[in-house]
Amino acid sequence: TEYKAGDIMSGENVSHVWLSLGPCNDGSVVILHSSPSGVHISGTPTPKGIENSQAIDLANKYMDKYYPVWNKKYPVKPFDYLEKYSQFRWYDNVLYDKYNLKNMYADNVMKIIFEEK
């Protein structure tokens, strides 16, 4: 499965939905999701199951920088959200992608979201 920023994923056997913030070079994905403890920027392992992924590193970087207290209390965990999820994607004729986020890697998407240079 190819993941792009803005994809909405819904669990097939679980009641869970997450938003893709973009893929990383190693195939992992930075995600935005809510759990009982609250909303998190998180990351997936790589498609091969490697938990030391670029997405987890990037999620930790942004959670530490912008939400340090929250991240210390509820640290990023490497959940595998890459399997058994249905995918929904908006297209430009329905929802305009002003910054072309859907064609960017997660590190660039995060810079735009957090207005970094």
Residue ranges and their predicted role:
Residues 1-48:
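...with weaker cross-activation on analogous glycine-rich loops/strands in unrelated enzymes
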Residues 46-117:
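Low-complexity, Gly/Ser/Thr/Pro-rich intrinsically disordered linker/tail segments
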